[in-house]
Each structure stands twice: as C-alpha cells, then as structure tokens.
Amino acid sequence: MSFDEGLYEWAKEALEPLGIVSLRRMMGAAVLYLDGTIFAVVEDEIWFKADADSAAIWDAEGCARFTFTDKDGKVETMNYRRAPTDVYDDVEAMQRWASLAVEAGLRSAAKKRPKKPKGAPPV
C-alpha cells in the first residue's frame, strides 16, 4: 500500500461543505475522518467504510469489498468498499458516497462500548 496525497487533497476539497476532513497515517495508507468520524481508507485508491445496513447499496454499485491476506495466508475482509469511479472527478458523487460511509462510521462508533477508566471497579 502506498498513500496518495492527491486523493486526500481531493477528498478534503470535495467534502469541505460537509465538514472537516482529517487523516491519520497507518501502515503506508491513511485513515480519513469527517468531523472526527472515520469514513475511508486511502492508499492508491479510496475505500469507503461500509456495514450491513449499507451493503446492498455498495453491492448494487458493484463496489468490491476490501480484502487482504493475513500472515497465515488466509484471505480476510474488512468493512470497506472500493469507491465508485465517479468519486474521483465528481464532487457530488464524492459527497454522496462519503456521506453513506460516514453514516456507517457513526453506526459503528455507536455500537462500541465506552472504555472503562483504568482502575474502575467491574460493573
């Protein structure tokens, strides 16, 4: 994986009306956030966050699931989908698909239990 700074700049510019896009570099790629909500991974292409609620929409568009081979040679998938080709040159498409990904990111964050402070007694 190699991070494409140009894709980040494009996403940042296209999504400016929706909020602030930020990134965190990770293993040669970058995780993108919109107003603090994870919504994509960028390497040499964009992979949008997805979930069971949005799977049918991504499937209908033919957006492949993110897959990788783990250290034991097993192929694994993650809840990210390859961006439709129109997001690379159409602001409205970028906003539409990124919004769907942000919704998945918000649902994912809502499902996670808050971490207990260190030293807190068991509940």
Label the predicted regions.
Residues M1-V123:
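Charge-dense, helix-prone N-terminal extensions
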